[in-house]
């Protein structure tokens, strides 16, 4: 049971800390972007969120708190519906629009009264709003659909593609208690043919769905923007002269490293269609070259270091083993394997808010890929079982980063 006065005191103290950090950095308190905050500000922000949630639980009590969590399916389903109806896209950036006019702009017919019921519910959660005349206008949350294309793409992906697999978790466990069978995972079951026991993988589904494939890339852009800035500070790059960025997309991360460390020659490897786009970029860095490569085949490059950033959490243990072993074939004594991924803490270790985010990501990887986020113990076991020459060096988590850098040296 939470101590209510103690939680309230902690909340007040951390609000003061956060306000102080906001004043120092000049960031906006309601922008939702913590990247300008220092370690103290980030910690205070997490504590405020946690304390506020504890106060809600304390105020509701155990039973109502559980029911509130389950009832949030109504919130999610209603917001999901408004996004899929493309309602936020049809609301003007400024001003408002009457319901009768709004429904005429939608591709899917819906009665004005029903649409009004949906919006009058979601506005209580901060999604869309009404003006004094009862016409629809944007809230700060819904305004991302007209002001932030990448975040909007991520939201559309979640509404159309990311939420539904969660309802198949129980059925997936009945078919595959290990959670490792890619074609029996929650998403595979969602996308399977009627009556089938197996379904397609995430990437096979996206291959046939260009709309959600683009939304997925938009979502990754949001994810990358919030994390790329940590890469340059996550490792002592002065010790590296040649680097292979495996699965490095169009070289956004490689460019951050190359701009900060001009001595490094970087080879970015990815699928042919991605490398083709990368080679067409006008802002290519002179120290970066691009190469088509399937990371399930032997690594062709000899380098000082090999970098896997946000790759392994998309794959189950068997596939991760295949990926690391293909890199291992190219390792020479003194070469390093660098993995930047989320690292699950032990229960209660560190910030509870951070742990919640990481464990949500873990279950998200399971529902979409039959994959996982891993603890340090799990990551070390996976890598070191592939090649006994690899000796673990260290783990470093940059302040404010969702991911940690892990390094091994080949002896």
UniProtKB/Swiss-Prot annotation:
Entry-linked InterPro entries: COMT-like (IPR016461), O_MeTrfase_dom (IPR001077), SAM-dependent_MTases_sf (IPR029063), WH-like_DNA-bd_sf (IPR036388), WH_DNA-bd_sf (IPR036390)
Enzyme class, spelled out: transferase
Keyword Glycoprotein among record annotations: no
Catalytic activity: 6-hydroxytryprostatin B + S-adenosyl-L-methionine = tryprostatin A + S-adenosyl-L-homocysteine + H(+)
Documented EC number(s): 2.1.1.293
Pathway noted in the entry: Alkaloid biosynthesis
Pfam family membership, one: Methyltransf_2
Residues reported to bind S-adenosyl-L-methionine: 270
Gene Ontology molecular functions: O-methyltransferase activity
Statement: the UniProt record of this protein carries the keyword Thylakoid: no
Catalytic residues (UniProt): 313 (proton acceptor)
Keywords assigned: Alkaloid metabolism, Methyltransferase, S-adenosyl-L-methionine, Transferase, Virulence
GO biological process, one term: secondary metabolite biosynthetic process
PANTHER family per the UniProt record, alphabetical: O-METHYLTRANSFERASE ASQN-RELATED, PUTATIVE (AFU_ORTHOLOGUE AFUA_4G14580)-RELATED
Family: Belongs to the class I-like SAM-binding methyltransferase superfamily. Cation-independent O-methyltransferase family.
UniProt function note: 6-hydroxytryprostatin B O-methyltransferase; part of the gene cluster that mediates the biosynthesis of fumitremorgins, indole alkaloids that carry not only intriguing chemical structures, but also interesting biological and pharmacological activities. The biosynthesis of fumitremorgin-type alkaloids begins by condensation of the two amino acids L-tryptophan and L-proline to brevianamide F, catalyzed by the non-ribosomal peptide synthetase ftmPS/ftmA.
Subunit structure: Homodimer.
Protein name: 6-hydroxytryprostatin B O-methyltransferase
Lineage, top ranks: Eukaryota, Fungi, Dikarya, Ascomycota, Pezizomycotina
């Amino acid at each position: 049971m939470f101590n209510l006065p103690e939680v309230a005191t902690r909340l007040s103290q951390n609000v003061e800390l956060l306000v102080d950090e906001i004043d120092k950095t000049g960031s906006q308190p309601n922008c939702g972007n913590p990247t300008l905050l220092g370690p103290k500000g980030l910690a205070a922000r997490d504590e405020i969120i946690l304390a506020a949630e504890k106060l809600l639980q304390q105020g509701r009590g155990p039973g109502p708190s559980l029911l509130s969590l389950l009832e949030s399916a109504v919130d999610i389903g209603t917001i999901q519906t408004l996004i899929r109806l493309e309602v936020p896209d049809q609301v003007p950036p400024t001003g408002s629009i009457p319901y009768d006019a709004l429904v005429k702009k939608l591709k899917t017919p819906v009665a004005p009264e029903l649409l009004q019921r949906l919006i009058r519910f979601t506005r209580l959660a901060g999604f869309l709003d009404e003006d004094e005349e009862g016409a629809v206008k944007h809230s700060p949350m819904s305004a991302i659909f007209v002001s932030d294309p990448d975040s909007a793409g991520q939201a559309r992906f979640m509404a159309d593609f990311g939420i539904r697999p969660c309802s198949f978790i129980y059925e997936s466990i009945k078919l595959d208690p290990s959670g490792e069978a890619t074609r029996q995972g929650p998403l595979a079951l969602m996308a399977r043919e009627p009556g089938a026991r197996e379904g397609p993988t995430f990437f096979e589904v996206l291959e046939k769905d260009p709309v959600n494939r683009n939304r997925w890339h938009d979502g990754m852009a949001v994810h990358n923007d919030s994390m790329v800035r940590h890469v340059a500070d996550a490792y002592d790059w002065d010790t590296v002269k040649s680097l292979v960025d495996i699965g490095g997309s169009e070289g956004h991360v490689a460019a951050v490293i190359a701009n900060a460390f001009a001595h490094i020659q970087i080879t970015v490897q990815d699928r042919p269609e991605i490398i083709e786009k990368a080679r067409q970029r006008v802002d290519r860095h002179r120290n970066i070259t691009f190469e088509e490569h399937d990371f399930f085949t032997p690594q062709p490059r000899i380098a000082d270091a090999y970098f896997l950033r946000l790759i392994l959490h998309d794959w189950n243990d068997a596939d991760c083993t295949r990926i690391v072993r293909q890199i291992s074939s190219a390792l020479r004594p003194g070469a390093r394997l660098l993995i930047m991924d989320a690292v699950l803490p032990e229960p209660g270790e560190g910030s509870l808010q951070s742990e919640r985010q990481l464990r949500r990501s873990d279950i998200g990887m399971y529902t979409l890929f039959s994959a996982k986020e891993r603890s340090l113990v799990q990551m070390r076991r996976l890598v070191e079982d592939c090649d006994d020459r690899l000796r673990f060096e260290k783990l470093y988590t940059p302040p404010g980063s969702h991911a940690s850098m892990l390094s091994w040296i080949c002896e």
